[in-house]
Design a protein with these regions (language model features):
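C-terminal edge strands of extracellular/lumenal beta-sandwich accessory domains
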Residues: 27-42, 61, 92-95, 122-166, ...
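Sec-dependent N-terminal signal peptides of Gram-positive bacterial secreted proteins and lipoproteins
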Residues: 2-24
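Beta-strand-rich modules
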Residues: 332-350
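Non-catalytic extracellular/lumenal accessory regions of secreted precursors
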Residues: 23-70, 79-81, 106-108, 144-193, ...
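Short S/T/G- and acidic-enriched coil/turn segments that sit immediately N-terminal to beta-strands
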Residues: 323-327
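Pro/Thr/Ser/Gly-rich low-complexity, intrinsically disordered linker/stalk tracts
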Residues: 273-298, 351-371
């Protein structure tokens, strides 16, 4: 009860500190509209530069993507004797002149680097010094692009703008701290929408390189920022590395929010681990041992069962990691014929019970006479 109360308090606190990303709006500034209209088309992997002055306070570029992928922007920060390296702000507008992304590189480094996942299309990238002490200083910059069909698509900070996610795919995204920013378009959260089937077993995975992050998988009725875990369909909320049974067929949302730290790369996925019957490939006899090979399938792990009887009476069982497709059985009796089979399994939790096992059917049976 104390844990649930604590989680409730944290959720309320986060609801006050987490700024829910705003819907993107068309450029309402005539200056921005004119800048977009005159932005110069830039090529990837080409060096460019801009010298800041009272007349040049912003740098605008137009880029065109023929496919989905990750755009990387490298910029050298202007240096001031008093302030040191001056932070750079970056905004991205889509072809409809809507701002979809804002980020400030506030690292105490000479270079500013921003990575962002974008869909195919035309974009306008604007960056500028965070302070007005950069006159006469030059910023060198370059755009690069890596095609990636399994990446975030900004802006994806709400349910309505969530990046579509397929099960059993690792998605790449970038998240960074925007604490204190008043921009409506800051990268406050990344949201992915994935469709799951009731009764199937899944594992939610999130692997950040670094950073202080809230990463949850929510049902379609749960408020973002909720922390208390639940497997109920109306309150569904689980954290990374959770294996669960989907309580309904429909859309679920992977929600990622970073409230501290520099921009970092992460991987997120929802994998179907419902056990499926594996195929046993071979059983090779060794010296008082046998090496078993099978075809990998879905599941959190495998069980290899062996016996001196074809009906598997008095059988022994060994557990094997889901990453393996082979196992060595030791301490067998010489000149004896052993029968072997394998199955996959998944271990999951529910609202009422933990560590529930679900098994697939047993594979075909093979035998070998031990040396």
């Amino acid at each position: 009860m104390k844990k649930k109360l604590l989680a409730t308090v944290l959720t309320l606190a986060l609801s006050l500190t987490i700024v829910q990303p705003s819907t993107i709006y068309a450029a309402d500034n005539e200056k921005v509209t004119q800048a977009i209209a005159t932005a110069e088309e830039k090529s990837f992997d080409t060096d460019y530069s801009v010298t800041w002055s009272d007349e040049v306070e912003e740098c605008w570029s137009k880029i065109t993507l023929n496919e989905q992928g990750i755009v990387k922007v490298n910029m050298t920060k202007p240096e001031n004797k008093t302030l040191g390296e001056i932070d750079l702000n970056l905004n991205i507008y889509n072809e409809n002149k809507k701002c979809i992304y804002y980020f400030t590189d506030s690292r105490d480094l000479i270079d500013a680097t921003v990575n962002v996942g974008l869909d195919k299309g035309t974009y306008y990238i604007e960056f500028n010094p965070n302070y007005s002490y950069a006159n006469g200083k030059t910023t060198n910059y370059k755009f690069s692009f890596t095609p990636n069909n399994d990446c975030e698509i900004e802006g994806n900070g709400t349910r309505d703008t969530a990046t579509a996610m397929k099960t059993d795919h690792d998605y790449t995204g970038y998240m960074g701290c925007n604490a204190g920013s008043l921009s409506d378009y800051k990268d406050a959260a990344d949201v992915y929408a994935v469709t799951l089937k009731k009764g199937q077993i899944y594992k939610y995975s999130f692997k950040p390189e670094t950073g202080t992050t809230i990463a949850k998988l929510y049902g379609n009725k749960v408020k973002f920022g909720t922390l208390w875990p639940s497997y109920d369909k109306d309150e569904f909320c689980v954290g990374p590395d959770t294996v669960f049974v989907a309580p309904y067929t429909g859309v679920y949302y992977a929600y990622i929010y970073n409230y501290l730290g520099d921009q970092y790369k992460y991987k997120v996925s929802v994998n179907n681990v419902t056990p499926k019957k594996p195929a046993l490939k071979s059983v090779k006899a060794g010296n008082k041992s046998a090496t078993v090979h099978w075809v990998k399938t879905k599941g959190a792990g495998y069980q290899v069962q062996y016996s001196l009887n074809s009906n598997f009476k008095d059988a022994k069982t060994m557990n094997v990691s889901s990453t393996k497709d082979t196992a060595k059985i030791k301490k067998l009796s010489s000149n004896k014929k052993y029968y072997v089979r394998v199955r996959s399994y998944a271990k999951y939790n529910t609202e009422k019970s933990n560590n529930i096992y679900k098994y697939s059917s047993w594979s075909n049976v093979k035998s070998a006479k031990i040396k």
